[in-house]
């Protein structure tokens, strides 16, 4: 095996990388484009590198951290992931986004007693920043209003 392949294996033992990230890392280490492509092909052929596995793990981690589909989608696009792959994996979670947004809201604002108009706007902006769309946010606040009697 080549030095580029060995270097790729060392990187992949630490964490998952997208194909683009792995290529960039190997190029930073000074390997030629041809060596990088060969190492990437070999890693994919042997199942050591998989964009599908990377996307599934990345989405699971980011959901657990309280991020929504819009932010996750943008981050994955920046990592060079195919938009169709992103959409197919995010689509598996489509029924859960309200629960994820509610969990993010509760983590940040559960102890809050102030439900003034400006405070609710601040909380909605927080969820928007986290990557949840307006439909999900409106459902969250309907749930919050019924639960907390706003």
Curated annotation (Swiss-Prot):
Gene3D superfamilies according to UniProt: Winged helix-like DNA-binding domain superfamily/Winged helix DNA-binding domain
InterPro entries: RecX_HTH_1st, RecX_HTH_2nd, RecX_HTH_3rd, Regulatory_RecX, WH-like_DNA-bd_sf
One BP annotation, GO: regulation of DNA repair
GO cellular component, one term: cytoplasm
Localization per record: Cytoplasm
Pfam families the UniProt entry points to: RecX_HTH1 (PF21982), RecX_HTH2 (PF02631), RecX_HTH3 (PF21981)
Chain's role: Modulates RecA activity.
Entry's family note: Belongs to the RecX family.
Protein name: Regulatory protein RecX
Organism of origin: Legionella pneumophila (strain Corby)
